[in-house]
């Protein structure tokens, strides 16, 4: 998992560049995340849905929904890495999780419960202060440290 400062820098960059959307390049192949995310899942969510958000946002279609979809997916996909080892947060990200939630396991349980409670389209994320929050449908926010679709 990336250091929180790297994530915040990426958010600042994306917010500043919000008028033109570019689909973030994947830092892994579409088969690298198996078995957590299959190639078919990535083909559909990245190759079809994310691309459509970017294309429609740049064409001025769909307003904030498309812009937020492009923005949020550009945060979502680059945060993953090929499975290996524990794949747990480290550094300042882990310190934040432990300070606010007590342990990474407690955080995972709370995060999963909140994320699974989202009805329809939406996102769960940990903000830069360690709180777990949700976004119903799509809305651009700039305090995201960890994002789960």
Describe each model-derived feature in a short phrase.
Residues 17-149:
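Feature for soluble, non-membrane regions of globular proteins
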Residues 1-20:
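Charge-dense, intrinsically disordered terminal/linker segments
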């Amino acid at each position: 998992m990336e250091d929180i400062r790297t994530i915040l820098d990426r958010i600042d960059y994306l917010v500043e560049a919000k008028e033109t959307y570019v689909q973030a390049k994947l830092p892994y192949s579409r088969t690298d995340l198996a078995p957590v995310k299959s190639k078919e899942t990535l083909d559909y969510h990245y190759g079809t849905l994310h691309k459509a958000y970017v294309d429609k946002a740049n064409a001025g279609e769909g307003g904030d929904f498309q812009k937020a979809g492009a923005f949020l997916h550009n945060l979502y996909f680059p945060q993953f890495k090929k499975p290996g080892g524990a794949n747990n947060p480290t550094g300042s990200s882990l310190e934040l999780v432990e300070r606010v939630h007590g342990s990474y396991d407690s955080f995972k349980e709370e995060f999963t419960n909140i994320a699974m409670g989202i009805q329809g389209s939406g996102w769960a994320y940990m903000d830069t202060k360690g709180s777990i929050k949700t976004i119903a449908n799509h809305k651009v926010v700039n305090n995201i440290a960890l994002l789960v679709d």
